[in-house]
Amino acid sequence: MADVMDERIRAIQITSGFGFTAGAFLVALSLFLYPSLPAANETNKILEILSKQESGGWMMLHATLVLGFVLVAIGFTGYGFLLHLKGSSGAASIITACAVIGGTLWAAFLSAEFFVHPFIMNLASLEPGLGTMLFTLYWFWKLGAIALAAVLLFTAVAAAGLAGTSRGLQPVWLGWGGAFFAVLGIVVYAIDFLSAGATGAPINPLRTPFVRFAVGLPLQLWLGAVGVMLMMEWANRRPVNASAGGRRDTVQTTGRAPKASLEQTPSMERQRPGAAPAAPSAPEPPPLPPPIP
């Protein structure tokens, strides 16, 4: 069982490490290339900026974002399994649920941009009023969904950082650093949400450089650092079978128990299996007394 558990841990490490590293790179690259947009209620200005974007480039930008968030969700799911094996089942449940739901929201609403952009641009050129109305409805719905998705991923980062530090999976500076920026992101989104509820202004914290670079960039660096660390541990953690020179136990390869050597087998166990032990011979009768003369 020890070698099976070791193989599980190594599989989790390489899967989660690759998901974190590749996902963080794709998300950071996409957000760096993403144009700065005005407030959500300034629909005419948003449409003016989007009209200058090429449909193919806009679709590829969002496809890269979708792939990045899917890989990040896979990384968090694997990290949750790793924490579960270490005994932190509560934190693992929080991480897995938040990552799966948050990644699904990001992927679902960003993938709509694959076809919304050319559709809205064509409709706005024919029916400006109808195009603006449909775009406004979609845009507000999208911003609310991805705001919730961002808070869920922030929660996953905070739980992974704190639980990983307590279980020795991360150094203290890395775990607590990720948790700090994740909590900071949650606070910023909460303030923006409360402000939108009080003033009626639209929620869109991603349009500000502070959220995109002061909060988002450190978290993407955290994802990349955790991913690289997991892949390094995977590379340094040799399989049990490889360390044993490639020899595998007979139970694992043939399903039969290994045969003991004659030197390790007692004399009573050297008999053929199924043969009954020989009955002890009867004692010889005592010698007759000498004849009487």
What kind of feature is each model-predicted range?
Residues 271, 275-281:
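A general signal for intrinsically disordered, low-complexity N-terminal leader regions
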